[in-house]
């Protein structure tokens, strides 16, 4: 099957029309730098990409091109292989993902304060449900720096900045490569649930405010597992391709500490 957002049916590639789909030149809102194309005259009119250092600069540029009436195409037959995103454990880079998303929202959308606050709450809520307190603090740090203004983009000491962000992330979320996680309670995999239960999970951050310790163990090999898969009162283990594990343990003390830092 070609992706989850296409209408190409599952089946043998020569019988489903997938070859025609892969070979077409498709129009999109943006493309990653390594396979996008646009007129050179467009650069003269809309200017150069923003100095965002990493992640999201291609998204902003695609949106900017579209706002000037330039189309962005993905030429068929061009691809670059890289490691699956499912096997990548995202730490400090979450800061740049969210900070640059805030910049993009401020530049290209109406009523940006309302949208930005909503996005911040959404990102933090999902991080809490996943017990990923490091991702939460990256979003808060990104928001704080965004509020300081465009001067933050003039920083060039990237090595120091990344080390500081990485230390901050691991202060809240740690990777354990020394052994296997031990928990006597039941181990659960992904299960479908009713929409009302999913809504309750989101609104209460998976019942984080209730002072009950972990009673379940959710395990997956996908580093980008969905917050909707996590059962109530669960510790989480992610098995990495290299044999290491990531443990996201439910921690009410960290939850309360982070909530105090972010008051909206």
Q: What kind of region is each of these model predictions?
A:
Residues 48-51, 63, 67-68, 91-111, ...:
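Catalytic-core region of carbohydrate-active enzymes that cleave or remodel glycosidic bonds
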């Amino acid at each position: 099957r070609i992706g989850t957002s296409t209408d190409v049916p599952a089946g043998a590639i020569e019988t489903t029309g997938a070859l025609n789909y892969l070979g077409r030149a498709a129009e999109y809102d943006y493309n990653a730098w390594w396979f996008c194309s646009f007129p050179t005259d467009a650069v003269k009119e809309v200017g150069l990409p923003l100095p965002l250092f990493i992640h999201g600069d291609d998204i902003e540029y695609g949106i900017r091109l579209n706002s000037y009436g330039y189309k962005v195409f993905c030429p068929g037959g061009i691809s670059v292989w890289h490691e699956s995103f499912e096997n990548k454990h995202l730490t400090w880079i979450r800061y740049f993902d969210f900070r640059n998303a805030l910049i993009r929202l401020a530049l290209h959308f109406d009523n940006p304060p309302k949208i930005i606050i909503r996005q911040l709450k959404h990102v933090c809520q999902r991080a809490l449900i996943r017990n990923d307190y490091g991702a939460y603090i990256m979003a808060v740090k990104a928001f704080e720096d965004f509020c300081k203004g465009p001067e933050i983009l003039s920083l060039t000491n990237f090595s120091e900045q990344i080390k500081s962000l990485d230390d901050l992330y691991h202060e809240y979320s740690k990777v354990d490569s020394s052994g296997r996680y031990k928990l006597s309670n039941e181990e659960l995999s992904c299960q479908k649930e009713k929409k009302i239960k999913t809504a309750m999970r989101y609104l209460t951050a998976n019942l984080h405010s209730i002072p009950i310790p972990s009673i379940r163990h959710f395990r997956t090999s996908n580093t980008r597992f969905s917050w909707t898969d996590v059962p109530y009162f669960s510790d989480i283990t992610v098995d990495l391709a290299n044999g290491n594990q990531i443990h996201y343990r439910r921690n009410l003390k960290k939850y309360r500490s982070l909530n105090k830092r972010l008051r909206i």
